[in-house]
Amino acid sequence: MAEPRQEFDVMEDHAQGDYTLQDQEGDMDPGLKESPLQTPADDGSEEPGSETSDAKSTPTAEDATAPLVDEGAPGEQAAAQAPAEIPEGTAAEEAGIGDTSNLEDQAAGHVTQARMVSKGKDGTGPDDKKTKGADGKPGTKIATPRGAAPPGQKGQANATRIPAKTTPTPKTSPATMQVQKKPPPAGAKSERGESGKSGDRSGYSSPGSPGTPGSRSRTPSLPTPPTREPKKVAVVRTPPKSPSAAKSRLQAAPGPMPDLKNVKSKIGSTENLKHQPGGGKVQIINKKLDLSNVQSKCGSKDNIKHVPGGGSVQIVYKPVDLSKVTSKCGSLGNIHHKPGGGQVEVKSEKLDFKDRVQSKIGSLDNITHVPGGGNKKIETHKLTFRENAKAKTDHGAEIVYKSPVVSGDTSPRHLSNVSSTGSIDMVDSPQLATLADEVSASLAKQGL
């Protein structure tokens, strides 16, 4: 109970600041400026006495939707005063919208209300606040002992507001409203403000539990006499519920809200929400390498103190002792020998071959011999068979031989002469002449 109590103290201070501003500006024309806490039907906030009594009373369906209106900005409340509060079931006269002539009465009533709030803060006890909250509660919404709703819920509740009352509210006649809202004399402003509140709000009793909706009185009460003693009305009170239960009722009123606790993303990223990537845990450790036990591939470190043998070779220069050296052929042993060839004398004597030399065949002896074959002569005689040839048979033709040797005499020779009586003259027969020429030519080719 300590935490809701602290919230109500803050809300009382907030409401007191609004009323003091209204008290300072009460002389202004009420038609030009309307405070966000102008009428009881326009604003959900109440005097500190009514707030404390409502904090102790049972939260109903009206209380569940009340923070969505009360905790808004004053500019939003002023903009949504006339169209938002009419569906609550209150009459136009109670809301202060129907008659423009009632604005002055309402402004005067609010000035007295602000002054009564300051007096209640100074001297009145909690009993007076309780009864005032119980008597003067119209069909408006009171702040519940819950914290301020988030802006998302505020806009949602303003958009989808549901009338909380199920039974129609009784309308007061215009005559009674004028009688109740007549401005009293200046001396009795405080009593008139208290009586006006109780008269306007006496048509409603304090909301009971949800199970007893018939406990509300629907008959408007007459204006109370101007006395300071508050009128006590029996109030059925139940222990206040936890904020979680009220929050569940608040969510059930505008409509079913989606269950956002079981929502999963498409790729299941909420399941791995606490997962940290392994790349961030990689530590680059800089360790010095221990090279004391490192061995080379070829084992060169084992032989690091080895001195190569080539470097230890010393070139010693020793003079060669040639005293005992002997040649291969023993020339030094015979170094003093003189060759005998040097003493040989070449003598040249002219030989007399003619006197001593004889030929093998004794040619010189027979030098004057004349061979006998030298006296023989080879005679060559030309055979003249053609010239002397005769035909075996005497056919009466004269054979004319023409020698192949060109001679000056081109006339054919008559080989034979036939008697004039039976002879054939070659001149007279040219065919025989050509035949004889052909035969002689063929014989000449054969070499005959």
UniProtKB/Swiss-Prot annotation:
Tau/MAP repeats lie at residues 251-281, 282-312, 313-343, 344-375. There is a cross-link at residues 33, 261, 266, 274, 288, 305, 318, 324, 328, 338, 350, 354, 360, 376, 382, 392 (Glycyl lysine isopeptide (Lys-Gly) (interchain with G-Cter in ubiquitin)). InterPro entries: MAP2/MAP4/Tau (IPR027324), MAP_tubulin-bd_rpt (IPR001084), Tau (IPR002955). The modification Phosphoserine is found at residues 35, 50, 198, 202, 205-206, 209, 221, 242, 244, 269, 292, 296, 300, 312, 331, 359, 363, 403, 407, 411, 416, 423, 429. Induction: During neurite outgrowth. Keywords: Acetylation, Cell membrane, Cell projection, Cytoplasm, Cytoskeleton, Disulfide bond, Glycoprotein, Isopeptide bond, Membrane, Methylation, Microtubule, Phosphoprotein, Repeat, Secreted, Ubl conjugation. It is found in: Cytoplasm, Cytosol; Cell membrane; Cytoplasm, Cytoskeleton; Cell projection, Axon. The modification N-acetylalanine is found at A2. It is a peripheral membrane protein. Residues 50-60, 408-423 have a biased composition (Polar residues). PANTHER family: MICROTUBULE-ASSOCIATED PROTEIN, MICROTUBULE-ASSOCIATED PROTEIN TAU. The tau/MAP repeat binds to tubulin. Type I isoforms contain 3 repeats while type II isoforms contain 4 repeats. Interacts with MARK1, MARK2, MARK3 and MARK4. Interacts with SQSTM1 when polyubiquitinated. Interacts with PSMC2 through SQSTM1. Interacts with FKBP4. Binds to CSNK1D. Interacts with SGK1. Interacts with PIN1. Interacts with LRRK2. Interacts with LRP1, leading to endocytosis; this interaction is reduced in the presence of LRPAP1/RAP. Promotes microtubule assembly and stability, and might be involved in the establishment and maintenance of neuronal polarity. The C-terminus binds axonal microtubules while the N-terminus binds neural plasma membrane components, suggesting that tau functions as a linker protein between both. Axonal polarity is predetermined by tau localization (in the neuronal cell) in the domain of the cell body defined by the centrosome. The short isoforms allow plasticity of the cytoskeleton whereas the longer isoforms may preferentially play a role in its stabilization. This is Microtubule-associated protein tau. The lineage of its organism: Eukaryota, Metazoa, Chordata, Craniata, Vertebrata.
